[in-house]
Amino acid sequence: MAFAASTACCKPSALLAPRASSSSPPSQARLCRPSTSAAFHGLRAPASAFALAPAPRRRAASTGIVCGKVSKGSVPPNFTLKDQDGKTVSLSKFKGKPVVLYFYPADETPGCTKQACAFRDSYEKYKKAGAEVIGISGDDAASHKAFAKKYRLPFTLLSDEGNKVRKEWGVPSDLFGTLPGRQTYVLDKKGVVQYIYNNQFQPEKHIGETLKIIQNL
């Protein structure tokens, strides 16, 4: 009798019969599919950037200290770029004074505008500490000039078209590599990196974090 019951429970029809379901669950691809574009601090990434993309390496919630090719305690490579007035500027020009060098995604985007204006509003505190503030993005000199004029930015903006310096310094990207990272470096008078701060979601925090370091150098 036990054998008969076991055989009855293992009938092929019972194994192959599909379960009744009022609705089939959505596939993983559908769950991961965004709308036609995704806005992030004013920049847009195509939907294809998200479709079944592999998970990125985790960082500390895109905030805090993140080190790439340029690390704390190192002397970063020199570079020469054009500023908002079309003049060539080299990093070595600022040796002998502390420097706050911040990489940002793009001019005229919400997060970057907030960050630039926050640096502007605290600029006198940086100057009092003897420091220079320099912003770098992939925008051209004309874009920087318009951006600086519109928001009355008193500091230097450098054009890193092609992102050569960004790559050399190892500035990490966000949003599956589609969004340039927001990372700030504090260099002392000797050109040595004393602090690296990364925070894409809270651009204004870069000012408070770097001021604390500058005022104690």
Swiss-Prot record:
Entry-linked InterPro entries: AhpC/TSA (IPR000866), Peroxiredoxin_BCP/PrxQ (IPR050924), Thioredoxin-like_sf (IPR036249), Thioredoxin_domain (IPR013766)
Pfam families: AhpC-TSA (PF00578)
Disulfide bond annotation, renumbered to this chain: C112-C117
Keywords: Antioxidant, Chloroplast, Disulfide bond, Oxidoreductase, Peroxidase, Plastid, Redox-active center, Thylakoid, Transit peptide
Active site: C112 (cysteine sulfenic acid (-soh) intermediate)
GO cellular component: chloroplast thylakoid lumen; chloroplast thylakoid membrane; cytoplasm
Keyword Magnesium recorded: no
GO biological process: one example: cellular response to oxidative stress
Organism superkingdom: Eukaryota
Catalysed reaction, written as an equation: a hydroperoxide + [thioredoxin]-dithiol = an alcohol + [thioredoxin]-disulfide + H2O
Entry coiled-coil feature ranges: none
Location relative to the cell: Plastid, Chloroplast thylakoid lumen
Assembly: Monomer.
Role this protein plays: Thiol-specific peroxidase that catalyzes the reduction of hydrogen peroxide and organic hydroperoxides to water and alcohols, respectively. Plays a role in cell protection against oxidative stress by detoxifying peroxides.
Protein name listed in UniProt: Peroxiredoxin Q, chloroplastic
Gene name as annotated: PRX1
